[in-house]
Amino acid sequence: MYEYIKGKLTHTDEAYVVIESFGIGYSIMLSERFLVDLRELMHQEVLIYVHSVIRETEHSLYGFSSRAERECFRLLISFSGIGPKTGLAILNMFPLQELCSVARLENVKAIASVPGIGKKTAEKLMVDLKQKLPALMPLYLEEPVVASSSTTTSFKEGIGALMNLGFSRLAADRMMTEAVKELSEDASVAELLPVALRKG
């Protein structure tokens, strides 16, 4: 089983990307939200955490921006009635942090709004998600998918601020990297953020 795939992003489609690594092209299914971020990185090196689905009629890879998101996906598909496509649809609509809030508030209506999930399935999900999701949050603090060239305090604080505004880790890292290039690594977070937001 693969942990992650690191290579050049060579193709994007409506539901998947192709990553070339050591002469092999890997087709990886992604959420729409993650796809939007990756389209900005065409022909660049990216790292995608993956989950393999192997069946008699299917051998697919599903990709995620972080280990935390992948573990959340694995938790979701462990529930009866939730397959890989539905699990991906849930993560597309609710990033991990937001999904934790939905579960904590037992917002059945929000989960039921995801295509492929009915009210009964949503109600069952709420019970287990409320108990199990918080355990995944420490993973949420891991490094961004695309390693940045800067590890300054301002850079890290900027990424955190952008994520609090709703940007994914990948998008926040890209925006801050571009802001640092435009200004400098010595720039304060107050100087970097306005520039980073323009890059979004």
UniProtKB/Swiss-Prot annotation:
Q: Which Gene3D superfamilies match?
A: 5' to 3' exonuclease, C-terminal subdomain, DNA helicase RuvA subunit, C-terminal domain, Nucleic acid-binding proteins
Gene Ontology CC, one term: Holliday junction resolvase complex
Q: Name one GO biological process term.
A: DNA recombination
Its UniProt domain note says: Has three domains with a flexible linker between the domains II and III and assumes an 'L' shape. Domain III is highly mobile and contacts RuvB.
What is the documented function of this protein? The RuvA-RuvB-RuvC complex processes Holliday junction (HJ) DNA during genetic recombination and DNA repair, while the RuvA-RuvB complex plays an important role in the rescue of blocked DNA replication forks via replication fork reversal (RFR). RuvA specifically binds to HJ cruciform DNA, conferring on it an open structure. The RuvB hexamer acts as an ATP-dependent pump, pulling dsDNA into and through the RuvAB complex. HJ branch migration allows RuvC to scan DNA until it finds its consensus sequence, where it cleaves and resolves the cruciform DNA.
Q: How does it assemble?
A: Homotetramer. Forms an RuvA(8)-RuvB(12)-Holliday junction (HJ) complex. HJ DNA is sandwiched between 2 RuvA tetramers; dsDNA enters through RuvA and exits via RuvB. An RuvB hexamer assembles on each DNA strand where it exits the tetramer. Each RuvB hexamer is contacted by two RuvA subunits (via domain III) on 2 adjacent RuvB subunits; this complex drives branch migration. In the full resolvosome a probable DNA-RuvA(4)-RuvB(12)-RuvC(2) complex forms which resolves the HJ.
Q: Which named protein is this?
A: Holliday junction branch migration complex subunit RuvA
